[in-house]
């Protein structure tokens, strides 16, 4: 028995969703898109000039100049037109047409699509469950943030208690939280906790539930902090033709107004409202009163305002509902109440109007009577009616300070439309990304909007009469508000477009099932991802750059039809979903989404007006580059470049372009992973000048594209440093730098060091200029310092200059570092050689002219900086240009769908990018000035009493032919000895003061905003607050009495490394002098 295998087998959640077998029509076809976790392509074939694929998540059609990406659950119907045409009708009003060469092929794909878009037999057939299971299955310890981001934030999880506190409900004297609906025993379409007046008992609530349709009793959902008025919601009363009444229902409705009088907004002397309610005390949620008379409101607590009952229907429709057992309130039965009818259409009229709108928007060719056809759909008229109803509610609460009760027939379609829209008009919190999530979760999900029936993804139901774009219509109204008030919403139009897509996509479980009870019974929240993981606050794609935080303005929109706009981004067909957006959005995408290198497709789509003259001819001849309409893609000419490259004997290392400027070496293209080089000894002296001109003109074109004219002068000043930067050549046999700490046999890499080159020859210049160029290449050492998860790619700012610090990405560098970093993006490798004493040495390529040497008071500083960069660049690793695996398509977001384009936001990001580049340029200039002051302070003789140092050192000049003779000449000895007296820095006597956490909302370096997944980190050296990407390195700081490695930012890390290298070099310089004196 003990030898038998165990009867239990442990499986992962993803094993419940095995991948399906791929059916290819042609073997040469490849899947044209990167699949999501859990996604499997089932069919792959060809259409007329297109590749078509069907997975368990989407329909993908790749045309020559465009791409169609449609989730399967967004497809409403599939039809065959004209024998060879397939027409896909989507639920967001779009229509996709695909042509096939044969009738048989068209019918075959019609059957495949029809089977793929059938109603699910069970909820596990929805892709949201497979997606979440595979996200868990592929997650490792390093990718833990992926699962963390699948969940909504704490503001969504604890929204009820947070909202009660934020809105200032007095839970002691006016309101109470009733748990009568615990386990949904009273009403399945309501949440478990309900807010009612404090004196209303649970028994009375049960009696009221028998009188309201679907037991949806009047409950309070919002309180305006400035006026104290509240908004309540419910369903219609069941009066019927018999005229039934319910005393408890009438008492509950009038009690809402009385409770508002007991919990008013107290005006402070400065005019700001203050809530006197005690929110921290215990509530009366579990109190069971025998009679409401014992807890009636205190007389004199304030005169209650007249309550406004807003009926979303017309008066005719409300009276007609009495034949079905419904009806409306009579003002005679409800004292101190007023009834207003809004005249909004029911779901059947909205569905017909939407179908007419879809037909008009997809007419081919473009109709000549477009405006009259659009008017005949009455879609804009329905939006106008909704906005008017919400404005009535907002005006009553804000201006008249009256409580409002909103209902329609059942209370889950037009009621959430009016209530949530009014809350957005009243409360600026709901116009933020965080508040909007709370609003949708509360008014739409908690209070039972039937998303499964209205969106058409409820299993085993084919009732078309239940489908209606109710939520889409409400989002259209939000779009109208965003159009009229572009500065009062934290999110942009792309946010709303994404929300429309995932209302129907079934990629996330947020909008599955009909109510909260069904979601908990089916465990949907734990088995699916949340849509707010994509639309979270930290995602800069959906941030409105025009947003003005801190404004408490109540919005009063213009509701006339002539003031409304058709939502073209959703309703009109996209002629080319990828091409128009890529050219504008490429520079704003997150780095990880662009892949490690430029995708060949994106290079082909580069606008030719941004290209140069014939790049290949210019590089060979050294002529000036002029901006014309040449081919922007050099990959097509790779063969020509390789044929032009030459090689000689020897296994020399490949040298980059800036090194070639000093060494007069012709460029050579990489071939696989081989490392070869060419040495041309007989080059004319003008070759470096020509290449310098090429570099300068290429820099000019890059700057003209990326930078505005407002900072042209700053760019020119900074570019002057780049013109002088190249490589310091060192003798191959003697000019070596020994690394005492290196004991491995691995290969090291060539060190490109900036120097001063003029007309192809190295000149004697001040080391201050060398230090300037050094600063430009210092950032190279940061390449391997900032690891980042690919799942966090949307957390980075789009336009910051810190993209270059992310490993494995394309080298998208700041404009002021193009001249130095471009050559280093190649795979520059070096050989590790053994010296005579057995230590590893790093050999610098090139020969040192006899005329070059560092002399003067800056000699020590220059050598220290060189040593520092030697140590830093040696540990760096650069990726080759050729990427072995294809990069993901850059127009896709994390959900596999296109990124919505917004021209206004793109222009604002360009302005933001220019501003950040200007700030970055000014910071670098300040750093240079500080560096120059530090050099002067370091090299200046200390102010101390005169002393005779002639007997301390004996200067013996050896004549062994070494190039180091001039360094230890008599003229430089005195300056070196004087420079050994290093003055005490003022910072060494001070204690670093930390910036408090509450004062830092953004990273001090990359300016990214802190939130739940991007936490604050203090640098122990400077005390500033950084994100994890900018502050994750550790070093001991003896100056701060911190002898164990502690957390420091990248800037301090570089500064400390430079200081240590300077000290080490100072000690190395003293050893020859001491040996000579002995």
UniProtKB/Swiss-Prot annotation:
Record-listed E.C. numbers: 3.1.3.95
Keyword Acyltransferase: no
Protein task: Lipid phosphatase that specifically dephosphorylates the D-3 position of phosphatidylinositol 3-phosphate and phosphatidylinositol 3,5-bisphosphate, generating phosphatidylinositol and phosphatidylinositol 5-phosphate. Decreases the levels of phosphatidylinositol 3-phosphate, a phospholipid found in cell membranes where it acts as key regulator of both cell signaling and intracellular membrane traffic, in a subset of endosomal membranes to negatively regulate both endocytic recycling and trafficking and/or maturation of endosomes toward lysosomes.
This protein's encoding gene: mtmr4
Name of the protein described by the UniProt record: Phosphatidylinositol-3,5-bisphosphate 3-phosphatase MTMR4
GO biological process: midbody abscission; negative regulation of endocytic recycling; phagosome maturation; phosphatidylinositol dephosphorylation; regulation of autophagy
Residue stretches in coiled coil: 904-935
Organism in which the protein naturally occurs: Xenopus laevis (African clawed frog)
Family that this chain belongs to: Belongs to the protein-tyrosine phosphatase family. Non-receptor class myotubularin subfamily.
Biased composition (Basic and acidic residues): 968-982
Sequence positions that bind Zn(2+) 1: 1003, 1006, 1027, 1030
Residues binding a 1,2-diacyl-sn-glycero-3-phospho-(1D-myo-inositol-3-phosphate): 321, 346-347, 409-414, 454
Myotubularin phosphatase domain residues: 154-571
Catalytic activity, as annotated: a 1,2-diacyl-sn-glycero-3-phospho-(1D-myo-inositol-3-phosphate) + H2O = a 1,2-diacyl-sn-glycero-3-phospho-(1D-myo-inositol) + phosphate; a 1,2-diacyl-sn-glycero-3-phospho-(1D-myo-inositol-3,5-bisphosphate) + H2O = a 1,2-diacyl-sn-glycero-3-phospho-(1D-myo-inositol-5-phosphate) + phosphate; 1,2-dioctanoyl-sn-glycero-3-phospho-(1-D-myo-inositol-3-phosphate) + H2O = 1,2-dioctanoyl-sn-glycero-3-phospho-(1D-myo-inositol) + phosphate; 1,2-dioctanoyl-sn-glycero-3-phospho-(1D-myo-inositol-3,5-bisphosphate) + H2O = 1,2-dioctanoyl-sn-glycero-3-phospho-(1D-myo-inositol-5-phosphate) + phosphate
Binding site for a 1,2-diacyl-sn-glycero-3-phospho-(1D-myo-inositol-3,5-bisphosphate): 321, 346-347, 409-414, 450, 454
Molecular function per GO: molecular adaptor activity; phosphatidylinositol-3,5-bisphosphate 3-phosphatase activity; phosphatidylinositol-3-phosphate phosphatase activity; protein phosphatase binding; protein tyrosine phosphatase activity; zinc ion binding
Record's compositionally biased regions (Low complexity): 270-282
Active site residues of this protein: 408
């Amino acid at each position: 028995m003990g030898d038998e295998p165990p009867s239990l087998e442990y499986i992962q959640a993803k094993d419940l969703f095995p991948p399906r077998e791929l059916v290819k029509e042609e073997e040469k076809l490849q899947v044209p898109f990167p699949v999501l976790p859990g996604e499997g392509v089932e069919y792959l074939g060809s259409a007329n000039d297109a590749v078509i694929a069907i997975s368990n998540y989407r329909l993908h059609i790749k045309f020559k100049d465009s791409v169609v990406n449609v989730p399967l659950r967004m497809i409403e119907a599939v039809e065959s037109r004209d024998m060879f045409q397939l027409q896909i009708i989507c639920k967001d009003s779009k229509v996709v047409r695909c042509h096939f060469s044969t009738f048989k092929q068209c019918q075959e794909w019609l059957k495949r699509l029809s089977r793929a878009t059938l109603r699910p037999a069970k909820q596990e057939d929805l892709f949201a469950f497979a997606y979440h299971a595979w996200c868990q299955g592929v997650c490792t310890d390093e990718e833990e943030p992926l699962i963390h981001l699948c969940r909504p934030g704490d503001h969504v999880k604890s929204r009820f208690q947070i909202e009660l506190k934020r809105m200032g409900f007095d839970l002691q004297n006016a309101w109470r939280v009733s748990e009568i609906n615990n386990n949904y025993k009273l009403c399945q379409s309501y949440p478990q906790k309900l807010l009612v007046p404090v004196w209303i008992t649970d028994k009375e609530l049960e009696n009221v539930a028998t009188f309201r349709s679907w037991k949806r009793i009047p409950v309070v959902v919002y309180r305006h902090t400035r006026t104290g008025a509240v908004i309540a919601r419910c369903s219609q009363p069941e009066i019927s033709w018999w005229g039934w009444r319910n005393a408890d229902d009438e008492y509950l409705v009038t009690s809402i107004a009385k409770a508002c009088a007991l919990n008013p907004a107290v005006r402070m002397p400065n005019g700001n409202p203050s809530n006197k309610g005690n929110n921290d005390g215990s509530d009366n949620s579990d109190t069971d009163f025998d009679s409401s008379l014992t807890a009636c409101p205190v007389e004199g607590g304030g005169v209650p305002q007249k309550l406004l009952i807003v009926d979303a229907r017309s008066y005719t429709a409300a009276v007609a509902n009495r034949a079905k057992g419904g009806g409306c309130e009579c003002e005679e039965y409800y004292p101190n109440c007023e009834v207003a009818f809004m005249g909004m259409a029911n779901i059947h009229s909205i569905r017909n109007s939407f179908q007419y709108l879809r037909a008009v928007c997809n007419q081919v060719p473009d109709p000549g009577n477009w405006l009259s056809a659009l008017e005949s759909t009455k879609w804009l008229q329905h939006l106008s009616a909704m906005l008017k109803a919400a404005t009535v509610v907002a005006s009553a609460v804000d201006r008249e300070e009256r409580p409002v009760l909103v209902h329609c027939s059942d209370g889950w379609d037009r009621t959430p439309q009016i209530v949530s829209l009014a809350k957005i008009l009243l409360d600026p919190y709901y116009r933020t990304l965080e508040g909007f999530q709370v609003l949708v979760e509360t008014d739409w999900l908690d209070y039972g909007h039937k998303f499964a029936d209205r969106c058409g993804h409820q299993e085993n139901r084919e009732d078309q009469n239940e489908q209606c774009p109710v939520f889409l219509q409400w989002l259209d109204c939000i779009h109208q508000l965003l159009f009229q008030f572009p500065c009062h919403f934290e999110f942009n139009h792309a946010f709303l477009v994404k929300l429309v897509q995932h209302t129907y996509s079934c990629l996330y479980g947020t909008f599955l099932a009909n109510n909260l009870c069904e979601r908990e019974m089916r465990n949907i929240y734990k088995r699916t991802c949340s849509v707010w993981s994509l639309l979270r606050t930290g995602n800069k794609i959906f941030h409105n750059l025009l947003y003005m935080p801190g404004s408490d303005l109540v919005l009063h929109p213009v509701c006339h039809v002539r003031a409304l706009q058709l939502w073209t981004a959703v309703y009109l067909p996209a002629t080319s979903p990828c091409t128009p957006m890529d050219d504008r959005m490429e520079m704003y995408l997150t780095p990880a989404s662009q892949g490690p290198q430029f995708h060949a497709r994106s290079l082909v789509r580069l606008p030719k007006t941004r290209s140069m003259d014939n790049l290949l001819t210019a590089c060979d001849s050294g002529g000036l580059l002029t901006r014309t309409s040449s081919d922007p893609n050099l990959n097509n000419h790779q063969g020509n470049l390789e044929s032009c490259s030459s090689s000689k004997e020897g296994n020399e290392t490949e040298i980059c372009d800036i090194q070639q400027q000093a060494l007069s070496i012709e460029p050579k293209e990489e071939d696989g992973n081989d490392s070869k080089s060419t040495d041309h000894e007989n080059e004319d002296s003008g070759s470096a000048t020509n290449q310098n001109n090429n570099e300068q003109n290429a820099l000019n074109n890059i700057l003209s594209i990326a930078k505005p004219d407002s900072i042209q002068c700053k760019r020119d000043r900074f570019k002057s440093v780049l013109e002088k930067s190249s490589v310091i050549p060192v003798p191959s046999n003697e000019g070596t730098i020994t690394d005492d700490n290196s004991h491995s046999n691995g290969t090291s890499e060539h060190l490109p060091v900036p120097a001063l080159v003029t007309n192809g020859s190295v000149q004697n210049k001040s080391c201050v200029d060398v230090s300037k160029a050094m600063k430009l290449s210092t950032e190279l050492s940061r390449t391997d310092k900032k690891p980042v998860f690919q799942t966090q790619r949307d957390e980075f700012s789009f336009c910051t200059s810190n993209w270059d610090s992310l490993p494995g990405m394309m080298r998208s560098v700041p404009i002021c570092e193009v001249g130095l970093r471009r050559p280093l993006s190649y795979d520059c490798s070096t050989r590790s050689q053994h010296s005579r004493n057995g230590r590893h040495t790093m050999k610098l390529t090139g020969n040192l002219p006899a005329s070059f040497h560092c002399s003067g008071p800056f000699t020590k500083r220059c050598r220290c900086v060189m040593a520092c960069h030697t140590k830093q660049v040696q540990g760096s690793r650069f990726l080759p240009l050729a990427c072995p695996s294809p990069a993901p398509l850059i127009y896709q977001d994390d959900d596999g769908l296109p990124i919505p384009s917004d021209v206004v936001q793109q222009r604002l990001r360009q302005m933001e990018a220019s501003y950040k580049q200007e700030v970055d340029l000014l910071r670098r200039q300040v750093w240079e000035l500080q560096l120059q002051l530090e050099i002067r302070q370091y090299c200046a003789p200390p102010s101390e009493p005169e002393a005779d140092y002639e007997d301390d050192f004996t200067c013996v000049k050896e004549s062994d032919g070494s190039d180091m003779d001039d360094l230890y000449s008599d003229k430089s000895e005195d300056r070196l000895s004087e420079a050994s007296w290093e003055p005490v820095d003022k910072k060494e006597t001070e204690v670093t003061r930390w910036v408090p956490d509450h004062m830092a909302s953004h990273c001090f370096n990359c300016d990214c905003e802190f939130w739940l997944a991007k936490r604050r980190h203090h640098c122990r050296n400077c005390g500033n607050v950084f994100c994890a990407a900018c502050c994750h390195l550790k070093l001991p700081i003896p100056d701060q009495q911190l002898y164990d490695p502690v957390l420091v930012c990248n800037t301090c890390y570089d500064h400390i490394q430079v200081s240590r290298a300077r000290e080490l070099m100072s000690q190395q310089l003293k050893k020859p002098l001491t040996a000579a004196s002995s």
